Amino acid sequence: MKKVIHTDDAPKAIGTYSQAVLADKFLFISGQIGLDPTTMELVEGFEEETIQVFRNISAICKEAGCSINDVIKFNVLLTDLSNFQKVNEIMEKVLEKPYPARAAYEVSALPK
């Protein structure tokens, strides 16, 4: 059985998807970009966008009854892999050890 997770503290879905779906004990969170949930606009600057992504994920986790520190894997998509170290620094600030598994990819563009 699956349960759709939605919170007003994260950006509403802008396509044919849910913010997250809880299936048994697993929470599947849709990809996030640095959208402010109140304005639905991207925040400015790479670091602020990244921090906003983690705020959005945290809000979704909270709505599902868990914490961002319960996440077991992140897939990080970057349009410029030179920002990878900044992502590491931000993750170190917002996550507790032990850190989750992670994969990072450089992509040509991200949707909005």
What are these regions (language model features)?
Residues 1-112:
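Short, polar/acidic, helix-capping and beta-turn segments at strand->helix junctions
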